Protein backbone atom coordinates (compact mmCIF):
# COMPACT_ATOMS: atom_id res chain seq x y z
CA UNK A 1 0.00 0.00 0.00
CA UNK A 2 0.97 3.64 -0.39
CA UNK A 3 2.06 5.83 2.50
CA UNK A 4 -0.96 7.82 3.65
CA UNK A 5 -0.83 11.56 3.06
CA UNK A 6 -2.43 14.37 5.05
CA UNK A 7 -5.46 14.39 2.75
CA UNK A 8 -5.97 10.65 3.34
CA UNK A 9 -5.90 10.99 7.13
CA UNK A 10 -7.47 14.24 8.20
CA UNK A 11 -10.47 16.50 7.68
CA UNK A 12 -8.66 19.82 7.95
CA UNK A 13 -11.84 21.68 8.89
CA UNK A 14 -11.47 20.24 12.40
CA UNK A 15 -8.26 22.05 13.38
CA UNK A 16 -7.05 25.64 13.57
CA UNK A 17 -3.98 24.40 11.70
CA UNK A 18 -5.97 23.40 8.62
CA UNK A 19 -4.49 25.99 6.28
CA UNK A 20 -1.01 25.36 7.64
CA UNK A 21 -1.23 21.59 7.21
CA UNK A 22 -2.62 21.95 3.69
CA UNK A 23 0.80 23.19 2.54
CA UNK A 24 2.34 19.76 3.08
CA UNK A 25 1.97 16.29 1.59
CA UNK A 26 2.94 14.22 4.64
CA UNK A 27 2.23 14.96 8.28
CA UNK A 28 5.84 14.83 9.41
CA UNK A 29 6.70 17.72 7.09
CA UNK A 30 4.58 20.07 9.22
CA UNK A 31 6.42 19.39 12.47
CA UNK A 32 9.53 21.52 11.95
CA UNK A 33 7.58 24.75 11.57
CA UNK A 34 4.85 23.96 14.07
CA UNK A 35 6.20 26.10 16.92
CA UNK A 36 6.46 29.16 14.68
CA UNK A 37 2.92 28.60 13.41
CA UNK A 38 1.57 28.36 16.97
CA UNK A 39 3.34 31.56 18.01
CA UNK A 40 1.89 33.45 15.06
CA UNK A 41 -1.58 31.96 15.49
CA UNK A 42 -1.67 32.77 19.19
CA UNK A 43 -1.23 36.46 18.46
CA UNK A 44 -4.41 36.45 16.35
CA UNK A 45 -6.69 35.03 19.05
CA UNK A 46 -9.49 37.17 20.43
CA UNK A 47 -10.96 37.96 23.83
CA UNK A 48 -12.26 34.42 24.28
CA UNK A 49 -8.65 33.34 24.93
CA UNK A 50 -6.33 34.25 27.80
CA UNK A 51 -2.54 34.38 27.53
CA UNK A 52 -1.89 32.69 30.89
CA UNK A 53 1.88 32.96 30.46
CA UNK A 54 4.04 34.18 27.56
CA UNK A 55 2.95 32.39 24.36
CA UNK A 56 0.54 30.06 26.19
CA UNK A 57 -3.02 30.79 25.06
CA UNK A 58 -5.99 29.03 26.67
CA UNK A 59 -9.67 29.36 25.76
CA UNK A 60 -11.64 30.85 28.63
CA UNK A 61 -14.04 27.90 28.68
CA UNK A 62 -11.25 25.29 28.80
CA UNK A 63 -10.62 23.51 32.09
CA UNK A 64 -6.99 23.37 33.22
CA UNK A 65 -6.10 21.46 36.39
CA UNK A 66 -3.92 23.49 38.79
CA UNK A 67 -1.21 20.80 38.75
CA UNK A 68 -0.88 20.75 34.94
CA UNK A 69 2.36 22.16 33.52
CA UNK A 70 2.08 24.03 30.21
CA UNK A 71 5.14 25.33 28.38
CA UNK A 72 5.27 27.70 25.41
CA UNK A 73 4.26 27.89 22.70
CA UNK A 74 0.87 26.27 23.23
CA UNK A 75 -2.73 26.96 22.25
CA UNK A 76 -5.57 25.11 24.00
CA UNK A 77 -9.04 25.29 22.47
CA UNK A 78 -12.59 25.71 23.68
CA UNK A 79 -14.04 23.27 26.22
CA UNK A 80 -10.83 21.26 26.25
CA UNK A 81 -9.85 19.52 29.48
CA UNK A 82 -6.27 19.31 30.74
CA UNK A 83 -6.25 17.01 33.75
CA UNK A 84 -4.05 16.83 36.87
CA UNK A 85 -0.37 16.15 36.28
CA UNK A 86 -0.49 16.69 32.52
CA UNK A 87 2.80 17.96 31.05
CA UNK A 88 2.51 19.98 27.85
CA UNK A 89 6.10 20.62 26.79
CA UNK A 90 5.40 23.25 24.19
CA UNK A 91 4.88 23.41 20.44
CA UNK A 92 1.40 22.00 21.08
CA UNK A 93 -1.79 22.97 19.27
CA UNK A 94 -4.71 21.38 21.08
CA UNK A 95 -8.13 21.80 19.50
CA UNK A 96 -11.64 22.25 20.85
CA UNK A 97 -13.33 19.56 22.98
CA UNK A 98 -10.07 17.64 23.39
CA UNK A 99 -8.70 15.84 26.46
CA UNK A 100 -5.12 15.74 27.74
CA UNK A 101 -5.26 13.37 30.67
CA UNK A 102 -3.66 12.81 34.01
CA UNK A 103 0.10 12.23 33.83
CA UNK A 104 -0.01 12.55 30.04
CA UNK A 105 2.94 14.18 28.24
CA UNK A 106 2.71 15.93 24.89
CA UNK A 107 5.19 17.93 22.83
CA UNK A 108 5.50 19.21 19.27
CA UNK A 109 2.10 17.87 18.33
CA UNK A 110 -1.30 18.75 16.92
CA UNK A 111 -4.48 17.40 18.48
CA UNK A 112 -7.47 17.98 16.25
CA UNK A 113 -10.85 18.86 17.74
CA UNK A 114 -12.21 16.08 19.92
CA UNK A 115 -8.94 14.13 20.12
CA UNK A 116 -8.38 12.38 23.45
CA UNK A 117 -5.21 11.23 25.21
CA UNK A 118 -6.85 10.81 28.61
CA UNK A 119 -4.73 8.50 30.78
CA UNK A 120 -0.95 8.10 31.11
CA UNK A 121 -0.15 8.68 27.44
CA UNK A 122 2.93 10.01 25.66
CA UNK A 123 2.47 11.87 22.38
CA UNK A 124 5.55 13.47 20.84
CA UNK A 125 6.16 14.79 17.32
CA UNK A 126 2.75 13.55 16.23
CA UNK A 127 -0.59 14.56 14.75
CA UNK A 128 -3.86 13.12 16.09
CA UNK A 129 -6.92 13.57 13.91
CA UNK A 130 -10.51 14.48 14.66
CA UNK A 131 -11.86 12.42 17.57
CA UNK A 132 -8.82 10.14 17.54
CA UNK A 133 -8.49 8.37 20.89
CA UNK A 134 -5.66 6.63 22.72
CA UNK A 135 -6.50 4.24 25.55
CA UNK A 136 -4.81 4.25 28.94
CA UNK A 137 -1.04 3.80 28.76
CA UNK A 138 -0.84 3.86 24.96
CA UNK A 139 2.22 5.73 23.70
CA UNK A 140 3.39 7.28 20.45
CA UNK A 141 7.08 6.44 20.58
CA UNK A 142 9.14 9.03 18.71
CA UNK A 143 12.78 7.92 18.99
CA UNK A 144 14.52 4.84 17.62
CA UNK A 145 16.56 2.68 19.98
CA UNK A 146 19.53 2.90 17.60
CA UNK A 147 19.24 6.72 17.48
CA UNK A 148 18.87 6.67 13.69
CA UNK A 149 16.56 8.75 11.53
CA UNK A 150 12.96 7.59 11.40
CA UNK A 151 11.83 5.90 8.19
CA UNK A 152 8.24 5.18 7.13
CA UNK A 153 7.88 1.92 5.21
CA UNK A 154 5.24 -0.06 3.39
CA UNK A 155 5.60 -3.03 1.04
CA UNK A 156 5.51 -0.56 -1.89
CA UNK A 157 7.61 2.39 -0.81
CA UNK A 158 10.01 3.82 1.75
CA UNK A 159 9.95 7.41 2.96
CA UNK A 160 13.15 8.84 4.41
CA UNK A 161 11.93 11.57 6.77
CA UNK A 162 15.33 12.86 7.86
CA UNK A 163 13.95 13.26 11.38
CA UNK A 164 15.58 11.86 14.49
CA UNK A 165 12.27 12.22 16.30
CA UNK A 166 8.93 11.34 14.75
CA UNK A 167 5.94 9.84 16.49
CA UNK A 168 2.67 8.85 14.85
CA UNK A 169 -0.03 10.13 12.53
CA UNK A 170 -3.47 9.00 13.70
CA UNK A 171 -6.27 9.49 11.23
CA UNK A 172 -9.68 10.86 12.14
CA UNK A 173 -11.57 8.66 14.62
CA UNK A 174 -8.73 6.15 14.99
CA UNK A 175 -8.97 4.13 18.21
CA UNK A 176 -5.83 2.89 19.97
CA UNK A 177 -6.23 0.28 22.71
CA UNK A 178 -4.73 0.40 26.18
CA UNK A 179 -0.93 0.03 26.40
CA UNK A 180 -0.50 -0.23 22.65
CA UNK A 181 2.84 1.04 21.35
CA UNK A 182 2.92 3.07 18.15
CA UNK A 183 6.48 2.81 16.88
CA UNK A 184 8.32 5.84 15.47
CA UNK A 185 6.91 6.89 12.10
CA UNK A 186 3.78 4.75 12.35
CA UNK A 187 0.60 5.84 10.56
CA UNK A 188 -2.91 4.63 11.41
CA UNK A 189 -5.67 5.42 8.93
CA UNK A 190 -9.11 6.87 9.49
CA UNK A 191 -11.60 4.80 11.50
CA UNK A 192 -9.08 2.04 12.23
CA UNK A 193 -8.84 0.23 15.57
CA UNK A 194 -5.69 -1.07 17.25
CA UNK A 195 -6.28 -3.67 19.96
CA UNK A 196 -4.73 -3.31 23.43
CA UNK A 197 -1.05 -4.28 23.90
CA UNK A 198 -0.38 -4.34 20.16
CA UNK A 199 2.83 -2.94 18.67
CA UNK A 200 2.22 -0.99 15.46
CA UNK A 201 4.93 -0.39 12.85
CA UNK A 202 4.62 1.11 9.39
CA UNK A 203 1.28 2.05 7.87
CA UNK A 204 -2.21 0.79 8.71
CA UNK A 205 -4.85 1.65 6.12
CA UNK A 206 -8.20 3.17 6.99
CA UNK A 207 -11.07 1.07 8.36
CA UNK A 208 -8.87 -1.78 9.58
CA UNK A 209 -8.70 -3.71 12.87
CA UNK A 210 -5.20 -4.52 14.10
CA UNK A 211 -5.58 -7.57 16.34
CA UNK A 212 -1.87 -8.30 16.70
CA UNK A 213 1.33 -7.59 14.80
CA UNK A 214 0.49 -10.12 12.07
CA UNK A 215 -3.32 -9.98 12.03
CA UNK A 216 -5.06 -7.05 10.34
CA UNK A 217 -8.71 -7.38 9.33
CA UNK A 218 -11.22 -5.14 7.59
CA UNK A 219 -13.48 -3.15 9.88
CA UNK A 220 -17.12 -3.75 8.95
Tell where the protein language model's regions lie, with residue ranges:
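Glycine-rich hexapeptide-repeat left-handed beta-helix
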Residues: 17-19, 111-113, 118-220
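Periodic small-residue-enriched repeat registers in elongated scaffold domains
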Residues: 92, 104-106, 115-117
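Terminal amphipathic alpha-helical/low-complexity segments used for targeting or macromolecular assembly
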Residues: 1-55, 60, 191, 197, ...
